[in-house]
Amino acid sequence: DYRKVDEQFDRIVSVGMLEHVGYPHLEEYFRKVDELLTDDGIALIHTIGHVDVPSPTSTWIDKYIFPGGYIPSLSEVSAAVEKTRMWAADVEVLRGHYGPTLHHWRDRFEAALPKVREMYDETFVRMWRFYLVACEAAFEEMFQGVFHLQLAHKQYAVPTTRDYLYQPGERDRMLHAAQ
């Protein structure tokens, strides 16, 4: 439970967790990231998000797939970050990546159906198919996207461009700079 962590870190990476925090806890989550991040640290938050205005969670998904989950909009995430000492050093919206990912997950699910049916009933199989197809469509039609937020306390903690990502060895140097 991230709320029980007291140690500070120079790097924090959160992948696919924010969606499970729930809307009522967005500000609490970012306050905790702020508290856990050292003054010269960098946090990377990877989350699914609404690419348009804030929207409620599907009642079906809330009931059957992710109870209490919430897909935030970028405006909601930004508002929560603004209430901390952190600033968004970089924001990237991965537009076309997650739809094909969900399609591959669905293909793998279908290929594994004999094993799945040993563990789950037909109701689960139908619900999971529906979930994967609906989410794939949401990404393909750009209702949802994936956001990468790079957060920091200090401007000097992060490079001024993304060039380091594409230079051999430089990415590793950045990742291990604090060691």
Spell out what each predicted region is.
Residues 26-29, 45-47, 53:
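Serine-hydrolase catalytic core recognition
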Residues 48-159, 173-174:
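Substrate-binding/catalytic lobe of Class I Rossmann-like enzymes that use SAM or dcSAM, i.e.
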Residues 2-13:
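A short acidic, Gly/Pro-enriched loop at the edge of an enzyme's catalytic core
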Residues 15-19:
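Residues lining the SAM
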Residues 27-42:
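A short glycine-rich, Lys/Arg-flanked "PGG" loop and its adjoining helix->strand segment in the class I
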Residues 4, 20-21:
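A short His-aromatic
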Residues 163-179:
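Short, cationic low-complexity segments
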Residues 12-13, 33, 136-139:
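Ligand-binding pocket scaffold of soluble enzyme catalytic domains
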